[in-house]
Swiss-Prot record:
PANTHER family: REDOX-SENSING TRANSCRIPTIONAL REPRESSOR REX, REDOX-SENSING TRANSCRIPTIONAL REPRESSOR REX 1. GO terms for biological process: negative regulation of DNA-templated transcription; response to redox state. Keywords: Cytoplasm, DNA-binding, NAD, Repressor, Transcription, Transcription regulation. GO terms for cellular component: cytoplasm. It comes from the Bacteria. Belongs to the transcriptional regulatory Rex family. Gene3D superfamilies: NAD(P)-binding Rossmann-like Domain, Winged helix-like DNA-binding domain superfamily/Winged helix DNA-binding domain. The keyword tRNA processing does not apply. Transmembrane segments: none annotated. This is Redox-sensing transcriptional repressor Rex. Its main location: cytoplasm.
Length: 210
């Protein structure tokens, strides 16, 4: 199985299925059908079965899926059967919101270091993690064996931060700066431009009105 051939939309839906299975498991439900999953996340049962089929056979025909087993398989597929060391650079309003988001730790993304250049923020503590100066980024990220870097700095500084993260050996970057970053092919890059997402929404709303 070559992961690169898996549609990105399928990976996104697997994450949604995983969250739904977490809720279902908390309710004490032992087995679940593709129809139940579909109803819970807003897709068709056929789509659920197709997404899971990329990764093998799950469940029993006429019975459904064991909730815990299916959830465990999906977590493994998503790489969430382990914890990930994450560093965050940029402690503005967005950075603060990201560092205090409990969902990261619940999913295995552990923010082990935080960096900023503001003297008033350096030395403060957020969720038990001290804010360090950016000039210590490479040193600390290497020491922590950081695997993922989150960039939430202004656009003019984003490439410099990306270069530092790459030098420190991070394997993936989540970039919130609205700028195109240059990274080597072995580094996974995901850009999140909130304005672009809002523009997609306004386009879709406008299309419906037309």
């Amino acid at each position: 199985m070559k992961t690169l051939k898996i549609p990105e939309a399928t990976i996104i839906r697997l994450s949604v299925y995983s969250r739904h299975l977490t809720d279902v498991d908390r309710k004490g439900i032992v087995t679940i059908s593709s129809g139940d999953i579909a109803e819970g996340v807003g897709v068709s049962p056929a789509q659920v079965r197709k997404d899971l089929a990329y990764f093998g056979e799950f469940g029993t025909r006429g019975v459904g899926y064991n909730v815990k087993d299916l959830h465990r398989h999906i977590l493994k597929i998503l790489g969430l059967s382990q914890d990930w060391s994450v560093c965050l650079v940029g402690m503005g309003n967005l950075g603060l919101a990201l560092t205090t988001y409990k969902g990261f730790r619940e999913r295995g993304f552990i923010i082990t270091s935080i960096f900023d250049n503001d003297p008033q923020k350096i030395g403060t503590t957020v969720n038990g993690v001290e804010v360090l100066p950016v000039d210590r980024l490479e040193e600390v990220a290497k020491a922590n064996k950081t695997q993922i870097g989150i960039i939430s700095v202004p656009s003019p500084y984003a490439q410099e931060i990306a270069d530092k993260l790459i030098s420190a050996g991070v394997q993936a970057i989540l970039n919130f700066a609205p700028v195109v970053l240059n990274v080597p092919p072995e580094v996974e890059l995901r850009n999140v431009d909130l304005a672009v997402n809002l523009e997609v929404l306004t386009f879709n709303v406008g299309t419906r009105r037309a």
